[in-house]
Amino acid sequence: MKKTDVVIVGAGAVGCAVARELSKYEISVIVVDQNEDVGGDASKSNSAIIHTGYDAAPGTLESQLVVAANPMYDKITEDLDVPFARIGAVLPAITEEQYEQLPGIQEKAFRNHVYDVEFKTREELLEMEPNLNPEVKGGLYIPRESIIDPFILVQAYAENACANGVEFQLETQVTGCLLYTSPSPRDATLSRMPSSA
């Protein structure tokens, strides 16, 4: 039976990011995934947007993590040579009802410590984006909303983690896990999946 300090279940964006971070320490790490490559499942079909957290529910774990993670991507993408662009986003209000919701959305952003969300008039939005619906009444501009290549990002996380000693066991399922109530090592049982070849 192989001993390791940490087993990460899942080689998607989160699993590979955690593996990369843990690879900086003097611990043994194994990443297990049932797929034949990293970045499968949700990581291969996401929106490729790095959010600021402007519209997350204030006080939630989601808002805390998204707001904290957003500024990290500048260094991560530079270190790993991953395509990344802070292109900003526009939240246009076309109807009167949408327009009336803008102050509440901006207030939510401020409560999430995203202070750079700006109100834009109809004219300002059409100057920024001439192809917007001409019925636009105004909107919000979120300058730090960004785009990234999620496939390259996950691959870069995994390659960096691997180069730093993390072991990846792909096509492997976790078939059991023993948990203890007192602080002590946990045991996991792994099973290699039959090859599809």
Q: What do the predicted segments below correspond to?
A:
Residues 48-128:
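Dinucleotide-binding Rossmann-like beta1-alpha1 core, especially the glycine-rich loop
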Residues 144-178, 182:
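Helical element adjacent to the flavin cofactor pocket in flavoenzyme catalytic cores
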Residues 6-30:
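N-terminal Rossmann-like FAD-binding beta1-loop-alpha1 element of flavoenzymes
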Residues 1-3:
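A short, basic/flexible loop-to-alpha-helix module at the beginning of a structural domain
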Residues 41-48, 132:
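Short, flexible, mixed-charge acidic loops at enzyme active sites
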Residues 24-42:
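Glycine-rich FAD pyrophosphate-binding loop
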Residues 27, 114, 166:
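Short phosphate-binding/catalytic loops that engage adenosine nucleotides
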Residues 180-197:
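Single conserved hydrophobic/aromatic residue that forms the stacking wall/gate
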